[in-house]
Amino acid sequence: MGYLKKVGMCISLLIVIIFVTSCGGGNKITGDSKETQIKKSFAKTLDMYPIKNLDDLYDKEGYRDGEFKKGDKGTWGISSAMVKQPKGKIMRSRGMYLFLNRNTRTAKGYFIVDVTSNDTLKKTEDKEKRYPVKMVNNKIIPIGPINDEGIKKEIENFKFFSQYGDFKGLKNYQNGDYSYNSEAPTYSAKFQLSNDDYNVKQLRKMYDIQTKKAPKLLLKCTGDLKGSSIGHKDIEFTFVENQEENVFFTDSLEFTPSEDY
């Protein structure tokens, strides 16, 4: 009788342990490993790269949830920006944001030039200038006259990273640093790349990147790991990051309700 009682107590204790374990792991992902699930989530977007013809996005469906109104086909938002701050100098960034409305099959956005100076005796000064643009037949065109021929040419020749980047080998990236916060929710993956990496070579071709340091790649997302139209995913290639010098590149591709833009 005593033996049966002990067995019953052990079974009860085991049930309690299983219950507590299953309910208490706030940042624990069941099923596939955390790394695998995070990679799969980013792959849903990054597998689309490269999108050589941005007009293809008009016929490309993205993740939909209850945030979309009935009949709304959604809008693709894409952006790419290069940020440089040589040692002892001001920070300059140049990039473009474009929003492709699948309902109207039109795309508008802006090219941005930003200069940020930090004087220890004054407040940080941020000077930003936006140039409205539109896209017609996969070509970026300024809206309105631009006196600066250099800026005009830069706009017309601009390429988003999503047009030439390639993440088909993402699943093979090794030694990643993964984080997941189910309460925020946010998740990310960081990798140390080499200068032989395809995407790093492409960035060096597109931009005058002086440093020879290989960048770190950060994939980060705000939103549910299972998918959400509220959150957004960002890509960052950080070549140099400290108080005196910064060189990094950012990129984003997201699908949202059209009323957000």
UniProtKB/Swiss-Prot annotation:
InterPro entries, sorted: Csa, Csa_sf
Lipid-acceptor residues (S-diacylglycerol cysteine): C23
Primary location: membrane
Subcellular location: Cell membrane
Lipid tethering residues (N-palmitoyl cysteine): C23
GO cellular component: plasma membrane
Membrane topology: Lipid-anchor
Family (UniProt): Belongs to the staphylococcal tandem lipoprotein family.
NCBIfam families in alphabetical order: SA_tandem_lipo
Protein name: Uncharacterized lipoprotein SAB0392
Organism from which the protein derives: Staphylococcus aureus (strain bovine RF122 / ET3-1)
Top-level taxonomy: Bacteria, Bacillati, Bacillota, Bacilli, Bacillales
